[in-house]
């Protein structure tokens, strides 16, 4: 399971070191793609295959489904972890997520998310994420 929040620096070549716990879960190669909320999603090859199977079931007759599939798959790339534990984040993905110098890498159960510091701080300050509202949603979900 991928959990935790880590702050790292993107070097001038677009590389970032992944936390060792995340490297163990994701493997030497994994998929990185555009995520929701202007962050990046990273999936192990196994989790990506599971996700692909689910997404194959989306109706191609739906314009929204086609748009989502294009968004999600066109931005995807296979990343390989180097001997120093770093990955190279392609320029198009760095631009999409506004990744500059400092980034937050978080674990969200079956995926990682890579956030720019600015976007992460804004997300955490979002009033709709108050503890009370989260508790209410958890109760609604029976958690």
From Swiss-Prot:
Q: What GO biological process term is on the record, naming one?
A: negative regulation of DNA-templated transcription initiation
Q: Would you tell me the protein name for this molecule? A: Transcriptional regulator MraZ
A GO MF term: DNA-binding transcription factor activity
- Per UniProt, residues of the SpoVT-AbrB domain are 5-47, 76-119
Per its UniProt record, what NCBIfam families does this chain match? division/cell wall cluster transcriptional repressor MraZ (TIGR00242)
Q: Which PANTHER family does UniProt cross-reference here?
A: TRANSCRIPTIONAL REGULATOR MRAZ
**Family listed:** Belongs to the MraZ family.
Keywords, comma-separated and alphabetical = Cytoplasm, DNA-binding, Repeat, Transcription, Transcription regulation
Q: Which organism is it from?
A: Caldicellulosiruptor saccharolyticus (strain ATCC 43494 / DSM 8903 / Tp8T 6331)
Subunit arrangement? Forms oligomers.
